[in-house]
């Protein structure tokens, strides 16, 4: 056999694998020795032009032993601690020789010998370490010096740990901290240890691996240390530096109880006793931390700085095009540094920069450029840099998870098997929606929880020693199936029995609190028992029979869209033996409500745009309707805040019964009675003088429901569906494969009266659509005013095969831009529908339709549109109203036009679930 040290392979002869965030390279010659394995089948299928890394959604730490076996055909001694998990991986990857070796080991016919060459390089360091490697946009060419090389786990973001953030090749500890925790304990972040800052998270450098126990205490107020913990001196030294009184007291109590249970609780200090955390050191503004971070790097690393802001100008962000920001974007999905959260902080930022020296000059220039008076671009001019784009996020989308002192990679499908995780807004924050996720927990313990999410079964090391901490973590994730799996774990039962002699005071977590499933909102995530997932757990004992191995099949699913940093990555979906049964709670990935886990900013600030109500699960607090608008933008839209499709509830598009016929049906819009319409927030047309009286007027009000008994002609919407029936996202996963793959025959759209087309209103149901700024808010339907019916008429109405693999979509607009775009569309459609519903004379309705058409086609300016609209009889017309409405239309119309183009593209690509339309010309010609 060739000596390990003599192995040298060129980059062209290497296959690259990303296993749960661990990066491995295997020579072609070694992998070819296992021709029946899934690894060889998929890697060898790559063409020479495909320089990709195959992604496997499995535990990377365990794959080290698989990797070592691929090189040496031997097992390392260290693999004994996790044989069950190693067995599961070998079975899923169809590595039959490794399975035979594990069987022999189990039966005592194979003995492991401890030799220096058997110890993988990565195992010599704690799992809390990482080593610096260059972050590039293609697979790294790792120097393979011996078969002992078992892969590089990018536990810290490679881009962050490379120049310019850390110009070192030494091993460094790091930790991801939610900003809420930093605000509570400011001493955690200093100028020296801050590595990066985002809207929801701060990344800091730590002095020791024991720092994770400190963060765990600050979250739970409990000292949870491993059995026989020996590094108490190191931990105590770190605690003294932080000067957090309750933490210091908890560690002191633990040292007093050395030899007892490793669980010490400390009640939270009462107000006024927070020591440094409350009185000595106050919370620093974000701009102090962000600017202090940037000035540590040369201008060449920053590139050209620029300031971005929300539309109301209250929140400022700084970004650049230098190497620093490029590295951060590759790993976190966003590189915007938050500067301010309120209007008042903008003034404070200006005053702060005025007092700074030349070091802050690039920041000063960027801020001055941003604050210079600018005029809005004409509505007929769209940015040359902007193009309509619709990005698809499939269940195989790779998600990076940052958990305390570790990071992992998995797929969106895995996270959605148990949607309780993403619904847990106390523990989960999206850094960049659909790309990177911050989980507020212990990184080392989350490895076992993630394996449960993948496999539906707990796989713990044979000598697991952190039971108190693991129990605490399981309880706080609120996943019933996980709690039940721990309660049934034999190792856990044995451990609790060993602790029976200890009193309840010293050992309060002797029994695990199991969260049971009820009939609450989460019940709707349950999956049809007939449908199974691709990743199923396998018991070690159940797989001793060779028969299922020969039947094991694997398939590769290519992700249709990958994040920028993973363009070279494909996803291997491991399918295990057919007889394996999934334990726990089966669930479907096809429901998207759990994806609404919100960053902290979108709920707690009145400057944020109002939220769209989630149609399935409410994860955010409703804004208080009584609070007055506090920002210029909110004051501006207060006039039209009720123009959120006045008839949105009344002119409801009725769902059609599932019909097997392909005929085009018409659905009349339902108009509720006045009593039904009254409570709805959007039913008072503030811009119609004859529809509403002043809020201060105590007299009777005539709401939009007036005259319902004697209705005039109402709009009808002709729906056509890309598939046989209207399908919701929740129902999509429950369909049989035949239902998904059989589109309905194409239905022609009617002629829109040629050039005499005054426009149409579309109602498009589609997968959840998010912005391109990482926000977690989304829309699942769009009401669009359009004059481009010809584009839709010539579009194939058959469902795209991609639709089956769509979890959500992203438009090339920010969430805020999409929000105001929808407001503008609903305003235009509302004034038309309200005129029809109010039985206005045909001349008035025609005038309103004509004005909307001329505005949309840019044949009239926004100012002239407002003047002509308010001049129509029945509208309130005063100078104040004109100015506010003109400003609002001028602001939102460009966003609406961009949003309309994105929706058109969505329909053309066959990504809509259903489309209903109403051609407005018919109402102008009816007698």
UniProtKB/Swiss-Prot annotation:
InterPro entries: SKP1/BTB/POZ_sf, T1-type_BTB
Residues with Phosphoserine modification: 270
GO biological process: male meiotic nuclear division; protein homooligomerization
Cited SUPFAM superfamilies: POZ domain
Region (Disordered) location: 664-760
Keywords, ordered alphabetically: Activator, Meiosis, Nucleus, Phosphoprotein, Repeat, Transcription, Transcription regulation
Domain annotation BTB: ranges: 18-72, 399-486
GO CC aspect terms: nucleus
Main location, first listed in the record: nucleus
Gene3D superfamilies (UniProt xref): Potassium Channel Kv1.1, Chain A (3.30.710.10)
KO phenotype (gene knockout): Males are infertile and spermatocytes fail to complete meiosis and show defects in metaphase I organization.
CDD domains: BTB1_POZ_KCTD19, BTB2_POZ_KCTD19
Repeat in keyword set: yes
Subcellular localization(s) per the UniProt record: Nucleus
Tissue note: Detected in adult testis.
Chain intervals with Basic and acidic residues compositional bias: 731-743
Subunit and interaction comment: Identified in a complex with ZNF541, HDAC1 and HSPA2. Identified in a complex with ZNF541 and HDAC1. Identified in a complex with HDAC1, HDAC2, DNTTIP1 and ZNF541.
Summary of the function given for this chain in its UniProt record: Transcription regulator which is essential for male fertility and for the completion of meiotic prophase in spermatocytes. Regulates progression of the pachytene stage of meiotic prophase and promotes the transcriptional activation activity ZNF541. Required for the organization of chromosomes during metaphase I.
PANTHER family in UniProt: BTB_POZ DOMAIN-CONTAINING PROTEIN KCTD19 (PTHR14499:SF20), POTASSIUM CHANNEL TETRAMERIZATION DOMAIN-CONTAINING (PTHR14499)
Name this protein carries in UniProt: BTB/POZ domain-containing protein KCTD19
Organism: Mus musculus (Mouse)
């Amino acid at each position: 056999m060739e000596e390990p040290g003599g192995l040298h392979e060129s980059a062209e002869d290497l296959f690259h694998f990303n296993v749960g965030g661990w990066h491995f390279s295997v020579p072609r010659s070694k992998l070819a020795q296992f021709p029946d394995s899934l690894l060889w089948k998929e890697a060898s299928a790559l063409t020479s032009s495909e320089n990709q890394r195959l992604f496997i959604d499995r535990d990377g730490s365990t794959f080290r032993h698989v990797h070592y076996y691929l090189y040496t055909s031997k097992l390392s001694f260290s693999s004994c601690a996790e044989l069950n998990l190693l067995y599961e991986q070998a079975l899923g990857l169809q590595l039959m020789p490794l399975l035979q070796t594990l069987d022999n080991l189990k039966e005592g016919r194979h003995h492991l010998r401890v030799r220096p060459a058997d110890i993988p390089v990565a195992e010599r360091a704690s799992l809390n370490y990482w080593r610096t490697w260059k972050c590039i946009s293609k697979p790294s060419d790792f120097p393979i010096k011996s078969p002992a090389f078992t892969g590089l786990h990018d536990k810290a973001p490679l881009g962050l740990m490379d120049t310019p953030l850390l110009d070192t090749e030494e091993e460094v500890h790091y930790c991801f901290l939610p900003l809420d925790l930093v605000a509570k304990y400011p001493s955690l972040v200093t100028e020296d240890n801050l590595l990066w800052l985002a809207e929801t998270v701060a990344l800091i450098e730590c002095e020791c691996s024991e720092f994770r126990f400190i963060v765990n205490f600050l979250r739970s107020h409990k000292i949870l240390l491993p059995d026989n913990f020996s590094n108490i001196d190191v931990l105590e030294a770190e605690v003294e530096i932080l000067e957090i009184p309750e933490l210091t007291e908890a560690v002191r109590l633990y040292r007093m109880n050395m030899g007892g249970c490793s669980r010490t609780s400390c009640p939270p200090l009462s107000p006024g006793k927070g020591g440094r955390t409350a009185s000595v050191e106050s919370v620093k503004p974000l701009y102090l931390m962000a600017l202090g971070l940037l000035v540590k790097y040369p201008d060449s690393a920053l590139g050209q700085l620029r300031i971005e802001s929300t539309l109301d100008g209250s929140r400022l962000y700084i970004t650049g095009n230098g190497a620093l920001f490029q590295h951060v974007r590759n790993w976190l999905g966003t590189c915007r540094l938050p500067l301010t959260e309120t209007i008042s902080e903008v003034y404070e930022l200006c005053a702060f920069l005025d007092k700074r020296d030349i070091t802050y000059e690039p920041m000063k220039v960027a801020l001055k450029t941003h604050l210079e008076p600018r005029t809005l671009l004409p509505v007929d001019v769209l940015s040359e840099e902007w193009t309509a784009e619709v990005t698809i996020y499939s269940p195989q989308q790779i998600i990076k998870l940052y958990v305390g002192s570790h990071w992992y990679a998995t797929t969106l499908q895995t996270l959605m098997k148990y949607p309780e995780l993403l619904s847990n807004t106390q523990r989960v924050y999206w850094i960049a929606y659909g790309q990177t996720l911050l989980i507020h927990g212990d990184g080392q313990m989350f490895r076992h929880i993630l394996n449960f999410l993948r496999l539906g079964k707990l796989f713990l090391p044979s000598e697991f020693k952190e039971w108190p901490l693991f129990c605490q973590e399981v309880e706080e994730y609120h996943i019933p199936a996980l709690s039940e799996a721990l309660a049934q774990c034999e190792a856990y039962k044995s451990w609790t029995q060993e602790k029976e002699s200890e009193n309840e005071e010293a050992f309060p977590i002797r029994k695990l609190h199991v969260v049971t499933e009820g009939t609450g909102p989460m019940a709707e995530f349950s999956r049809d028992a007939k449908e199974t997932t691709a990743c199923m757990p396998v018991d070690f004992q159940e797989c001793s029979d060779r028969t299922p191995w020969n039947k094991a099949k694997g398939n590769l699913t290519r992700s249709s869209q990958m994040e920028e940093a993973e363009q070279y990555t494909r996803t291997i979906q491991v399918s295990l033996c057919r007889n394996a049964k999934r334990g726990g709670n089966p669930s479907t990935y096809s429901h998207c409500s759990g994806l609404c886990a919100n960053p902290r900013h979108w709920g707690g600030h009145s400057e944020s745009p109002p939220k769209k109500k989630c149609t399935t699960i409410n994860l955010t607090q409703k804004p208080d309707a009584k609070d007055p608008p506090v920002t210029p933008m909110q004051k501006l839209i207060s006039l039209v805040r009720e123009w959120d499709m006045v008839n949105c509830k009344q002119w409801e598009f009725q769902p059609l019964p599932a019909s097997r016929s392909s005929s085009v049906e018409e659905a009349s819009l339902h108009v509720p009675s006045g009593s039904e319409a009254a409570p709805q927030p959007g039913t008072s047309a503030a811009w119609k003088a004859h529809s509403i009286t002043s809020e201060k007027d105590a007299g009777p009000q005539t709401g939009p429901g007036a005259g319902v008994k004697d209705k005039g002609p109402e709009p009808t919407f002709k729906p056509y569906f890309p598939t046989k029936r209207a399908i919701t996202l929740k129902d999509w996963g429950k369909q049989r494969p035949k239902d998904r793959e059989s589109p309905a025959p194409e239905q022609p759209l009617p002629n829109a009266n040629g050039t005499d087309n005054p426009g149409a209103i579309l109602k498009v149901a589609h997968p959840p659509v998010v912005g391109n700024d990482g926000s977690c808010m989304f829309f699942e339907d769009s009401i669009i005013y359009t004059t481009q019916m010809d584009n839709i008429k010539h579009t194939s109405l058959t469902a795209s095969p991609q639709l089956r693999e769509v979890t959500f979509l992203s438009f090339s607009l920010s969430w805020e831009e999409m929000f105001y775009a929808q407001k503008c569309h609903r305003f235009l459609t509302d004034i038309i529908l309200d005129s029809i519903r109010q039985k206005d004379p045909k001349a008035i309705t025609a005038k309103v339709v004509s004005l909307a058409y001329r505005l949309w086609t840019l044949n009239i300016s926004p100012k002239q549109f407002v003047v002509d609209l308010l001049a129509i009889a029945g509208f309130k017309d005063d100078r104040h109203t004109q100015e506010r409405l003109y400003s609002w239309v001028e602001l939102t119309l460009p966003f609406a036009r961009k949003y309309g183009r994105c929706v058109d593209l969505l329909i053309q690509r066959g990504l809509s679930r259903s489309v209903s339309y109403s051609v407005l010309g018919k109402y102008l010609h009816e007698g």
